[in-house]
Swiss-Prot record:
It catalyses: S-ubiquitinyl-[E2 ubiquitin-conjugating enzyme]-L-cysteine + [acceptor protein]-L-lysine = [E2 ubiquitin-conjugating enzyme]-L-cysteine + N(6)-ubiquitinyl-[acceptor protein]-L-lysine. The U-box-like region is a truncated U-box domain. It is unknown whether it is functional or not. It comes from Macaca fascicularis (Crab-eating macaque). CDD domains: RING-Ubox1_NOSIP, RING-Ubox2_NOSIP. Transmembrane segments: none annotated. A motif (Nuclear localization signal) lies at residues 78-101. This is Nitric oxide synthase-interacting protein.
Length: 301
Protein backbone atom coordinates (compact mmCIF):
# COMPACT_ATOMS: atom_id res chain seq x y z
CA UNK A 1 0.00 0.00 0.00
CA UNK A 2 1.31 3.39 -0.97
CA UNK A 3 1.45 6.37 1.29
CA UNK A 4 -1.51 7.97 -0.51
CA UNK A 5 -3.82 5.16 0.63
CA UNK A 6 -3.22 6.06 4.27
CA UNK A 7 -4.53 9.62 3.93
CA UNK A 8 -7.88 10.47 5.53
CA UNK A 9 -9.30 11.59 2.17
CA UNK A 10 -8.64 8.33 0.39
CA UNK A 11 -11.71 6.47 1.70
CA UNK A 12 -14.21 5.26 -0.87
CA UNK A 13 -17.09 5.36 1.63
CA UNK A 14 -18.78 8.55 2.85
CA UNK A 15 -18.75 7.84 6.57
CA UNK A 16 -21.35 8.89 9.12
CA UNK A 17 -18.86 11.15 10.91
CA UNK A 18 -18.00 12.96 7.67
CA UNK A 19 -21.69 13.39 6.88
CA UNK A 20 -22.44 14.89 10.31
CA UNK A 21 -19.42 17.18 10.05
CA UNK A 22 -20.42 18.43 6.59
CA UNK A 23 -24.03 18.91 7.70
CA UNK A 24 -22.96 21.08 10.63
CA UNK A 25 -20.68 23.14 8.38
CA UNK A 26 -23.29 23.63 5.63
CA UNK A 27 -26.07 24.88 7.92
CA UNK A 28 -28.74 22.58 6.45
CA UNK A 29 -30.91 20.21 8.46
CA UNK A 30 -31.50 20.21 12.21
CA UNK A 31 -28.54 21.68 14.07
CA UNK A 32 -27.72 20.24 17.51
CA UNK A 33 -25.38 21.58 20.12
CA UNK A 34 -24.60 20.54 23.66
CA UNK A 35 -24.79 23.50 26.04
CA UNK A 36 -21.86 24.05 28.37
CA UNK A 37 -21.83 25.69 31.79
CA UNK A 38 -21.13 29.09 30.24
CA UNK A 39 -24.45 28.92 28.35
CA UNK A 40 -26.54 28.09 31.45
CA UNK A 41 -28.09 30.88 33.52
CA UNK A 42 -28.03 30.99 37.31
CA UNK A 43 -31.12 30.02 39.28
CA UNK A 44 -31.74 33.60 40.47
CA UNK A 45 -31.41 35.23 37.03
CA UNK A 46 -34.25 36.50 34.87
CA UNK A 47 -35.23 34.28 31.94
CA UNK A 48 -35.45 37.35 29.67
CA UNK A 49 -32.55 39.57 30.69
CA UNK A 50 -30.33 36.72 32.02
CA UNK A 51 -29.23 39.05 34.82
CA UNK A 52 -29.68 38.67 38.60
CA UNK A 53 -33.18 39.82 39.54
CA UNK A 54 -33.72 42.93 41.64
CA UNK A 55 -37.51 42.51 41.98
CA UNK A 56 -38.11 38.85 41.02
CA UNK A 57 -41.47 37.26 40.25
CA UNK A 58 -42.22 33.65 39.34
CA UNK A 59 -44.88 32.09 37.09
CA UNK A 60 -46.99 29.07 38.11
CA UNK A 61 -44.61 26.91 36.04
CA UNK A 62 -41.57 28.08 38.02
CA UNK A 63 -39.92 30.47 35.55
CA UNK A 64 -38.24 33.44 37.23
CA UNK A 65 -38.49 36.93 35.71
CA UNK A 66 -37.61 40.47 36.60
CA UNK A 67 -40.89 42.28 37.25
CA UNK A 68 -40.02 45.17 34.95
CA UNK A 69 -38.92 42.83 32.13
CA UNK A 70 -41.98 40.56 32.21
CA UNK A 71 -44.43 43.47 32.48
CA UNK A 72 -42.78 45.15 29.52
CA UNK A 73 -43.01 41.85 27.63
CA UNK A 74 -46.73 41.50 28.41
CA UNK A 75 -47.36 45.10 27.30
CA UNK A 76 -45.44 44.50 24.07
CA UNK A 77 -47.42 41.32 23.39
CA UNK A 78 -50.73 43.14 23.89
CA UNK A 79 -49.67 45.87 21.46
CA UNK A 80 -48.59 43.25 18.93
CA UNK A 81 -51.90 41.39 19.29
CA UNK A 82 -53.80 44.66 18.77
CA UNK A 83 -51.76 45.41 15.64
CA UNK A 84 -52.35 41.91 14.23
CA UNK A 85 -56.07 42.11 15.01
CA UNK A 86 -56.32 45.48 13.25
CA UNK A 87 -54.59 44.07 10.15
CA UNK A 88 -56.87 41.02 10.25
CA UNK A 89 -60.03 43.13 10.45
CA UNK A 90 -58.79 45.36 7.62
CA UNK A 91 -58.15 42.38 5.35
CA UNK A 92 -61.47 40.87 6.33
CA UNK A 93 -63.29 44.08 5.35
CA UNK A 94 -61.40 44.22 2.05
CA UNK A 95 -62.38 40.64 1.22
CA UNK A 96 -65.99 41.38 2.10
CA UNK A 97 -66.01 44.36 -0.29
CA UNK A 98 -64.44 42.21 -3.02
CA UNK A 99 -67.15 39.58 -2.61
CA UNK A 100 -69.87 42.24 -2.82
CA UNK A 101 -68.25 43.63 -5.98
CA UNK A 102 -68.15 40.16 -7.54
CA UNK A 103 -71.81 39.55 -6.67
CA UNK A 104 -72.74 42.94 -8.15
CA UNK A 105 -70.84 42.15 -11.37
CA UNK A 106 -72.46 38.71 -11.62
CA UNK A 107 -75.91 40.27 -11.18
CA UNK A 108 -75.19 42.82 -13.91
CA UNK A 109 -74.01 40.06 -16.27
CA UNK A 110 -77.19 38.11 -15.57
CA UNK A 111 -79.37 41.14 -16.37
CA UNK A 112 -77.37 41.93 -19.51
CA UNK A 113 -77.71 38.36 -20.77
CA UNK A 114 -81.44 38.41 -20.13
CA UNK A 115 -81.86 41.67 -22.08
CA UNK A 116 -79.83 40.30 -25.00
CA UNK A 117 -82.05 37.23 -25.18
CA UNK A 118 -85.19 39.36 -25.00
CA UNK A 119 -84.02 41.60 -27.85
CA UNK A 120 -83.31 38.57 -30.06
CA UNK A 121 -86.96 37.38 -29.99
CA UNK A 122 -88.82 37.82 -33.36
CA UNK A 123 -92.33 39.32 -33.01
CA UNK A 124 -93.79 38.28 -36.43
CA UNK A 125 -93.76 34.97 -38.35
CA UNK A 126 -91.12 34.49 -41.00
CA UNK A 127 -91.43 33.04 -44.47
CA UNK A 128 -89.20 29.98 -44.62
CA UNK A 129 -88.65 30.51 -48.35
CA UNK A 130 -87.05 33.94 -48.06
CA UNK A 131 -83.40 34.74 -47.46
CA UNK A 132 -84.29 36.66 -44.31
CA UNK A 133 -85.83 33.59 -42.73
CA UNK A 134 -82.59 31.69 -43.15
CA UNK A 135 -80.79 34.19 -40.97
CA UNK A 136 -83.75 34.64 -38.58
CA UNK A 137 -83.56 38.47 -38.60
CA UNK A 138 -82.82 41.22 -41.01
CA UNK A 139 -79.18 41.80 -41.97
CA UNK A 140 -79.25 45.19 -40.29
CA UNK A 141 -80.62 43.91 -36.98
CA UNK A 142 -78.69 40.64 -36.91
CA UNK A 143 -77.58 39.62 -33.41
CA UNK A 144 -74.81 37.15 -32.80
CA UNK A 145 -76.44 34.11 -31.20
CA UNK A 146 -74.93 31.34 -29.20
CA UNK A 147 -72.96 28.71 -31.01
CA UNK A 148 -74.79 25.41 -31.45
CA UNK A 149 -71.80 23.33 -32.47
CA UNK A 150 -69.12 21.96 -30.17
CA UNK A 151 -66.75 24.50 -28.60
CA UNK A 152 -63.69 25.31 -30.61
CA UNK A 153 -60.51 23.62 -29.43
CA UNK A 154 -58.42 26.54 -30.64
CA UNK A 155 -59.86 28.78 -27.92
CA UNK A 156 -58.71 26.36 -25.22
CA UNK A 157 -55.14 26.55 -26.46
CA UNK A 158 -55.05 30.34 -26.37
CA UNK A 159 -53.13 31.47 -23.30
CA UNK A 160 -53.09 35.03 -21.95
CA UNK A 161 -49.99 37.02 -22.75
CA UNK A 162 -48.79 37.39 -19.18
CA UNK A 163 -45.94 39.69 -20.18
CA UNK A 164 -48.39 42.41 -21.29
CA UNK A 165 -49.03 44.87 -18.44
CA UNK A 166 -52.79 44.61 -18.84
CA UNK A 167 -52.68 40.78 -18.62
CA UNK A 168 -50.07 40.49 -15.90
CA UNK A 169 -51.34 38.16 -13.13
CA UNK A 170 -51.94 39.92 -9.85
CA UNK A 171 -50.26 38.59 -6.72
CA UNK A 172 -52.84 37.96 -4.04
CA UNK A 173 -52.21 39.05 -0.49
CA UNK A 174 -51.47 36.35 2.05
CA UNK A 175 -54.57 35.39 4.00
CA UNK A 176 -54.13 36.32 7.64
CA UNK A 177 -55.36 34.02 10.37
CA UNK A 178 -57.25 35.44 13.31
CA UNK A 179 -54.63 36.13 16.00
CA UNK A 180 -55.03 34.78 19.49
CA UNK A 181 -55.75 37.36 22.16
CA UNK A 182 -53.95 35.32 24.83
CA UNK A 183 -50.56 36.47 26.10
CA UNK A 184 -48.27 33.47 26.52
CA UNK A 185 -45.20 32.87 28.66
CA UNK A 186 -41.98 33.30 26.62
CA UNK A 187 -40.50 30.13 28.13
CA UNK A 188 -43.35 27.64 28.54
CA UNK A 189 -45.74 28.99 25.88
CA UNK A 190 -48.70 28.71 28.28
CA UNK A 191 -51.20 31.55 28.90
CA UNK A 192 -49.81 34.16 31.27
CA UNK A 193 -51.56 36.95 33.17
CA UNK A 194 -50.22 39.61 35.48
CA UNK A 195 -52.23 38.16 38.35
CA UNK A 196 -50.40 34.83 37.95
CA UNK A 197 -47.04 36.35 38.90
CA UNK A 198 -45.91 35.64 42.46
CA UNK A 199 -43.34 37.91 44.16
CA UNK A 200 -40.19 36.07 45.26
CA UNK A 201 -38.14 36.98 48.33
CA UNK A 202 -34.66 35.46 48.43
CA UNK A 203 -32.91 35.19 51.80
CA UNK A 204 -29.39 36.63 51.38
CA UNK A 205 -26.40 34.78 52.78
CA UNK A 206 -25.16 37.93 54.49
CA UNK A 207 -27.77 40.60 55.14
CA UNK A 208 -25.07 43.26 55.64
CA UNK A 209 -23.89 42.98 52.02
CA UNK A 210 -25.65 45.19 49.49
CA UNK A 211 -27.05 44.01 46.15
CA UNK A 212 -23.90 44.93 44.19
CA UNK A 213 -21.79 42.88 46.56
CA UNK A 214 -24.14 39.90 46.27
CA UNK A 215 -23.86 39.83 42.46
CA UNK A 216 -20.10 39.32 42.64
CA UNK A 217 -20.47 36.26 44.86
CA UNK A 218 -21.06 32.72 43.62
CA UNK A 219 -23.19 31.84 46.68
CA UNK A 220 -25.66 34.64 47.28
CA UNK A 221 -28.77 33.19 48.88
CA UNK A 222 -29.73 30.53 51.41
CA UNK A 223 -32.86 28.55 52.25
CA UNK A 224 -35.32 30.54 54.37
CA UNK A 225 -35.76 27.60 56.79
CA UNK A 226 -32.63 25.44 56.91
CA UNK A 227 -30.12 28.14 55.87
CA UNK A 228 -28.62 25.79 53.28
CA UNK A 229 -26.82 27.48 50.42
CA UNK A 230 -28.82 27.79 47.17
CA UNK A 231 -27.24 27.21 43.77
CA UNK A 232 -27.98 25.61 40.41
CA UNK A 233 -27.14 22.24 41.94
CA UNK A 234 -29.78 22.64 44.66
CA UNK A 235 -33.41 22.04 43.67
CA UNK A 236 -35.54 24.69 45.34
CA UNK A 237 -39.15 25.88 45.45
CA UNK A 238 -41.11 29.07 46.11
CA UNK A 239 -43.90 29.20 48.69
CA UNK A 240 -46.74 31.27 47.23
CA UNK A 241 -48.13 32.95 50.41
CA UNK A 242 -44.80 34.33 51.62
CA UNK A 243 -42.68 34.17 48.45
CA UNK A 244 -39.86 32.52 50.44
CA UNK A 245 -37.40 30.28 48.61
CA UNK A 246 -36.66 26.93 50.27
CA UNK A 247 -34.96 23.74 49.15
CA UNK A 248 -37.01 20.80 47.90
CA UNK A 249 -35.43 18.68 50.61
CA UNK A 250 -36.92 21.03 53.19
CA UNK A 251 -40.29 20.83 51.45
CA UNK A 252 -40.36 17.04 51.44
CA UNK A 253 -39.03 16.52 54.97
CA UNK A 254 -40.53 19.44 56.90
CA UNK A 255 -43.20 21.46 55.11
CA UNK A 256 -45.30 18.65 53.58
CA UNK A 257 -45.94 17.12 56.99
CA UNK A 258 -48.10 20.03 58.19
CA UNK A 259 -48.59 21.95 54.89
CA UNK A 260 -48.07 25.26 56.69
CA UNK A 261 -45.94 28.15 55.45
CA UNK A 262 -43.07 28.41 57.98
CA UNK A 263 -42.77 32.17 57.39
CA UNK A 264 -46.37 33.41 57.53
CA UNK A 265 -48.15 30.41 59.09
CA UNK A 266 -50.71 30.18 56.25
CA UNK A 267 -52.10 26.85 55.10
CA UNK A 268 -50.51 25.50 51.93
CA UNK A 269 -51.77 23.42 49.03
CA UNK A 270 -49.84 21.60 46.33
CA UNK A 271 -50.53 24.57 44.03
CA UNK A 272 -48.83 26.92 46.50
CA UNK A 273 -45.50 25.07 46.20
CA UNK A 274 -43.88 26.26 42.95
CA UNK A 275 -40.78 24.34 41.91
CA UNK A 276 -38.24 26.86 40.64
CA UNK A 277 -36.80 26.20 37.18
CA UNK A 278 -33.04 26.34 37.62
CA UNK A 279 -30.42 26.54 34.92
CA UNK A 280 -28.48 23.41 35.85
CA UNK A 281 -24.79 22.82 36.40
CA UNK A 282 -23.71 21.88 32.89
CA UNK A 283 -23.52 18.18 33.77
CA UNK A 284 -25.94 15.64 32.32
CA UNK A 285 -26.91 14.44 35.78
CA UNK A 286 -28.32 17.81 36.85
CA UNK A 287 -31.74 16.88 35.42
CA UNK A 288 -31.86 19.87 33.06
CA UNK A 289 -32.05 19.58 29.28
CA UNK A 290 -28.69 20.70 27.91
CA UNK A 291 -29.27 19.82 24.25
CA UNK A 292 -30.30 22.72 22.01
CA UNK A 293 -31.86 22.11 18.58
CA UNK A 294 -32.63 24.44 15.70
CA UNK A 295 -34.56 23.35 12.62
CA UNK A 296 -33.09 24.48 9.32
CA UNK A 297 -34.02 23.82 5.65
CA UNK A 298 -33.13 20.34 4.45
CA UNK A 299 -31.28 19.77 1.18
CA UNK A 300 -32.64 16.63 -0.48
CA UNK A 301 -31.66 15.01 -3.75
Amino acid sequence: MTRHGKNCTAGAVYTYHEKKKDTAASGYGTQNIRLSRDAVKDFDCCCLSLQPCHDPVVTPDGYLYEREAILEYILHQKKEIARQMKAYEKQRGTRREEQKELQRAASQDHVRGFLEKESAIVSRPLNPFTAKALSGTSPDNAQPGPSVGPPSKDKDKVLPSFWIPSLTPEAKATKLEKPSRTVTCPMSGKPLRMSDLTPVHFTPLDSSVDRVGLITRSERYVCAVTRDSLSNATPCAVLRPSGAVVTLECVEKLIRKDMVDPVTGDKLTDRDIIVLQRGGTGFAGSGVKLQAEKSRPVMQA
